[in-house]
Amino acid sequence: MDNQEIKLLLIKKLNLEQANITGDSNHIKIIAIGNIFKNVSQVKRQQIIYAPLIDMIKEKHIHAVSIMSYTPEEWEKTKK
């Protein structure tokens, strides 16, 4: 599964406003932006993002993941 497919999967499954995926199957970096993260701890946010990817991780199609997650409001603040 390539980065574009991962992006579309996360957007669809998690109803994200935006997802940016970089890297390769050895290590992917995910920046996820969506209202699903409102009032959710960082640990729970990571669990939410891992859920649709878990089979790919188990099957070793993805080896390492770096996750950054934001609500739309948090994302806007990072851009200033």
From Swiss-Prot:
Signal sequence: where? Answer: none
Pfam families membership: BolA (PF01722)
Alphabetical list of SUPFAM superfamilies matching this protein:
BolA-like
Look up the domain of life of the source: Bacteria
What InterPro entries does this protein map onto?
BolA, BolA-like_sf, BolA/IbaG_stress_morph_reg
Family label:
Belongs to the BolA/IbaG family.
- Give the protein's recorded name: Uncharacterized protein BU385
Q: Which organism is it from?
A: Buchnera aphidicola subsp. Acyrthosiphon pisum (strain APS) (Acyrthosiphon pisum symbiotic bacterium)
